[in-house]
Protein backbone atom coordinates (compact mmCIF):
# COMPACT_ATOMS: atom_id res chain seq x y z
CA UNK A 1 0.00 0.00 0.00
CA UNK A 2 1.23 3.48 -0.91
CA UNK A 3 0.06 6.63 0.86
CA UNK A 4 0.89 10.12 -0.34
CA UNK A 5 0.24 12.67 2.39
CA UNK A 6 0.19 16.46 2.25
CA UNK A 7 2.77 17.74 4.75
CA UNK A 8 4.42 15.79 7.56
CA UNK A 9 3.44 12.17 8.20
CA UNK A 10 1.58 11.11 11.34
CA UNK A 11 3.98 8.22 11.92
CA UNK A 12 2.33 7.22 15.22
CA UNK A 13 -0.99 6.54 13.51
CA UNK A 14 0.54 4.90 10.44
CA UNK A 15 2.74 2.60 12.53
CA UNK A 16 -0.17 1.67 14.80
CA UNK A 17 -2.33 0.74 11.78
CA UNK A 18 0.45 -1.23 10.09
CA UNK A 19 1.42 -3.05 13.29
CA UNK A 20 -2.21 -4.05 13.88
CA UNK A 21 -2.27 -5.48 10.35
CA UNK A 22 0.96 -7.40 11.02
CA UNK A 23 -0.51 -8.87 14.21
CA UNK A 24 -3.76 -9.79 12.44
CA UNK A 25 -1.76 -11.63 9.77
CA UNK A 26 0.36 -13.35 12.46
CA UNK A 27 3.59 -11.86 11.09
CA UNK A 28 6.68 -12.11 13.26
CA UNK A 29 8.75 -9.46 11.46
CA UNK A 30 7.88 -5.77 11.39
CA UNK A 31 10.80 -3.80 9.94
CA UNK A 32 10.43 -0.02 9.94
CA UNK A 33 12.33 2.86 8.38
CA UNK A 34 11.29 6.43 9.14
CA UNK A 35 12.88 9.38 7.35
CA UNK A 36 13.05 12.51 9.50
CA UNK A 37 13.92 15.94 8.12
CA UNK A 38 17.11 16.90 9.93
CA UNK A 39 18.50 20.30 10.77
CA UNK A 40 21.18 21.30 8.29
CA UNK A 41 22.58 24.81 7.93
CA UNK A 42 19.82 27.39 7.68
CA UNK A 43 17.34 24.94 6.14
CA UNK A 44 13.95 25.12 7.87
CA UNK A 45 12.58 22.02 6.18
CA UNK A 46 12.14 20.20 2.92
CA UNK A 47 9.47 20.41 0.25
CA UNK A 48 8.64 17.46 -1.98
CA UNK A 49 7.13 17.31 -5.46
CA UNK A 50 5.79 13.95 -6.59
CA UNK A 51 4.73 12.75 -10.01
CA UNK A 52 1.90 10.67 -8.54
CA UNK A 53 0.99 8.60 -11.60
CA UNK A 54 4.60 7.48 -12.11
CA UNK A 55 5.12 6.84 -8.38
CA UNK A 56 2.00 4.68 -8.22
CA UNK A 57 3.14 2.70 -11.28
CA UNK A 58 6.64 2.25 -9.83
CA UNK A 59 5.25 1.20 -6.44
CA UNK A 60 2.78 -1.30 -7.93
CA UNK A 61 5.60 -3.04 -9.80
CA UNK A 62 7.71 -3.06 -6.67
CA UNK A 63 4.92 -4.12 -4.32
CA UNK A 64 4.50 -7.47 -6.06
CA UNK A 65 8.17 -8.51 -5.76
CA UNK A 66 8.12 -9.10 -1.96
CA UNK A 67 4.94 -11.20 -2.12
CA UNK A 68 6.93 -14.17 -3.44
CA UNK A 69 8.90 -14.09 -0.18
CA UNK A 70 5.78 -13.68 1.98
CA UNK A 71 6.59 -10.04 2.71
CA UNK A 72 4.16 -7.10 2.60
CA UNK A 73 5.47 -3.64 1.68
CA UNK A 74 3.89 -0.43 2.97
CA UNK A 75 5.11 3.05 2.12
CA UNK A 76 4.04 6.60 2.92
CA UNK A 77 5.66 9.77 1.59
CA UNK A 78 5.01 13.46 2.06
CA UNK A 79 4.21 15.89 -0.69
CA UNK A 80 4.62 19.60 -0.02
CA UNK A 81 6.42 21.12 2.95
CA UNK A 82 7.82 19.20 5.92
CA UNK A 83 9.64 21.11 8.64
CA UNK A 84 12.76 19.87 10.45
CA UNK A 85 12.23 17.17 13.09
CA UNK A 86 9.13 15.90 11.29
CA UNK A 87 8.79 12.76 9.18
CA UNK A 88 8.53 12.75 5.40
CA UNK A 89 9.01 9.04 4.61
CA UNK A 90 7.90 5.76 6.16
CA UNK A 91 8.54 2.27 4.89
CA UNK A 92 7.44 -0.98 6.52
CA UNK A 93 8.37 -4.46 5.39
CA UNK A 94 6.47 -7.12 7.33
CA UNK A 95 6.32 -10.86 7.02
CA UNK A 96 6.43 -14.22 8.73
CA UNK A 97 10.15 -14.02 9.43
CA UNK A 98 12.89 -11.42 9.71
CA UNK A 99 15.20 -12.95 7.13
CA UNK A 100 13.01 -12.27 4.11
CA UNK A 101 11.90 -8.81 5.26
CA UNK A 102 15.47 -7.64 5.90
CA UNK A 103 16.68 -9.20 2.65
CA UNK A 104 14.55 -6.72 0.69
CA UNK A 105 15.53 -3.59 2.61
CA UNK A 106 18.76 -2.62 0.87
CA UNK A 107 17.46 -3.48 -2.60
CA UNK A 108 14.23 -1.54 -2.04
CA UNK A 109 15.99 1.62 -0.81
CA UNK A 110 18.53 1.63 -3.64
CA UNK A 111 15.71 1.22 -6.14
CA UNK A 112 13.59 3.87 -4.42
CA UNK A 113 16.38 6.47 -4.42
CA UNK A 114 17.16 5.84 -8.12
CA UNK A 115 13.67 5.42 -9.57
CA UNK A 116 10.94 7.01 -7.46
CA UNK A 117 9.71 10.22 -9.14
CA UNK A 118 10.08 12.43 -6.07
CA UNK A 119 11.95 15.73 -6.14
CA UNK A 120 13.26 17.58 -3.11
CA UNK A 121 13.62 21.29 -2.41
CA UNK A 122 15.19 22.91 0.63
CA UNK A 123 13.08 25.45 2.52
CA UNK A 124 15.24 28.41 3.46
CA UNK A 125 14.22 32.01 4.17
CA UNK A 126 10.69 31.31 2.89
CA UNK A 127 12.03 30.09 -0.47
CA UNK A 128 12.12 26.68 -2.13
CA UNK A 129 15.62 25.86 -3.37
CA UNK A 130 15.82 22.88 -5.70
CA UNK A 131 18.18 20.20 -4.33
CA UNK A 132 20.05 19.65 -7.59
CA UNK A 133 22.91 17.78 -5.89
CA UNK A 134 20.42 15.10 -4.80
CA UNK A 135 18.86 14.75 -8.25
CA UNK A 136 19.45 12.20 -11.00
CA UNK A 137 17.81 11.25 -14.27
CA UNK A 138 14.96 8.78 -14.10
CA UNK A 139 15.24 5.78 -16.39
CA UNK A 140 13.00 6.28 -19.41
CA UNK A 141 12.48 9.99 -18.81
CA UNK A 142 13.10 12.86 -21.18
CA UNK A 143 11.80 13.89 -24.57
CA UNK A 144 13.56 11.14 -26.52
CA UNK A 145 13.01 8.30 -24.05
Swiss-Prot record:
EC number: 2.8.1.12
Gene3D superfamilies, sorted: Molybdopterin biosynthesis MoaE subunit
Domain of life: Bacteria
GO MF entry, a single one: molybdopterin synthase activity
Record SUPFAM superfamilies: Molybdopterin synthase subunit MoaE (SSF54690)
Entry-linked Pfam families: MoaE (PF02391)
Functional pathway: Cofactor biosynthesis; molybdopterin biosynthesis
InterPro entries: MoaE_sf (IPR036563), Mopterin_biosynth_MoaE (IPR003448)
Any one Gene Ontology BP term: Mo-molybdopterin cofactor biosynthetic process
Family: Belongs to the MoaE family.
Protein name according to UniProt: Molybdopterin synthase catalytic subunit
Organism of origin: Helicobacter pylori (strain J99 / ATCC 700824) (Campylobacter pylori J99)
